[in-house]
């Protein structure tokens, strides 16, 4: 569940912007103006009764259009790195790395947000805005989530929620967000540590 939610989260964070007024316009401005995004996060998964069933935290760095590093500090340490060609998922406690062709994994909505433009966004999602957030509803009913909501506060990305087909909600609260700061490019390179098991995933296998 964590890895599925993570790819959705990372992809959708890319659609957040710092503007508060005219949020759809802010999305378009994002694709024009924002290259890097960094910060820390707290992530919660809620069941269909609104009870928290999983909680985690960590930090992230994104370098558009095709690189990111999403790091979970606990309770189960995990690193997810996209280097532009391959997607690495390193489960630290399991001493296990799963690697995939990034283009195959990120080639469809919502992960296509990583490399798309605003026209792609409009093609993939029905967009609606309120005073507090932008709602994204997949045009293709076969996507991995039913709806996402992106929120901004005080001029920076603050939270997003994803409703999945099982009735669960993944909520991510973002803090210490920095836009267009320099990012150490080593964050987007990954060499499996000595002794870990490395698995090449089937190109048609999704993130689970």
Curated annotation (Swiss-Prot):
Monomer. Residues 1-21 form the signal peptide. It comes from the Bacteria. It is found in: Periplasm. Its main location: periplasm. Participates in the translocation of lipoproteins from the inner membrane to the outer membrane. Only forms a complex with a lipoprotein if the residue after the N-terminal Cys is not an aspartate (The Asp acts as a targeting signal to indicate that the lipoprotein should stay in the inner membrane). NCBIfam families: lolA. One of its GO terms (biological process) is lipoprotein transport. InterPro entries: LolA/LolB/LppX, OM_lipoprot_carrier_LolA-like, OM_lipoprot_carrier_LolA_Pbac. One of its GO terms (cellular component) is outer membrane-bounded periplasmic space. This is Outer-membrane lipoprotein carrier protein. The lineage of its organism: Bacteria, Pseudomonadati, Pseudomonadota, Gammaproteobacteria, Chromatiales. Keywords: Chaperone, Periplasm, Protein transport, Signal, Transport. Belongs to the LolA family.
């Amino acid at each position: 569940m964590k890895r599925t939610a993570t790819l959705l989260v990372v992809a959708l964070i890319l659609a957040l912007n710092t503007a508060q007024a005219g949020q759809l316009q802010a999305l378009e401005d994002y694709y024009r103006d924002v290259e890097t995004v960094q910060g820390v996060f707290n992530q919660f998964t809620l069941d269909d009764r609104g009870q928290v069933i999983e909680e985690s935290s960590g930090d992230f760095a994104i370098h558009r259009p095709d690189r990111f590093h999403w790091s979970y500090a606990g309770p189960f340490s995990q690193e997810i790195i996209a280097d532009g060609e391959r997607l690495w998922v390193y489960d630290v406690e399991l001493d296990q790395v799963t690697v995939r062709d990034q283009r195959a994994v990120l080639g469809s909505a919502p992960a296509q947000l990583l490399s798309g433009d605003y026209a792609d966004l409009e093609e993939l999602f029905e967009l609606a805005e309120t005073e507090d957030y932008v709602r994204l509803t997949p045009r293709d009913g076969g996507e991995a989530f039913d709806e996402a909501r992106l929120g901004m506060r005080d001029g920076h990305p603050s939270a997003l929620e994803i409703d999945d087909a099982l009735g669960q909600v993944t909520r991510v609260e973002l803090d210490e967000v920095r836009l267009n700061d320099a990012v150490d490019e080593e964050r987007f390179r990954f060499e499996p540590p000595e002794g870990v098991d490395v698995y090449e995933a089937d190109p048609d296998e999704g993130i689970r």
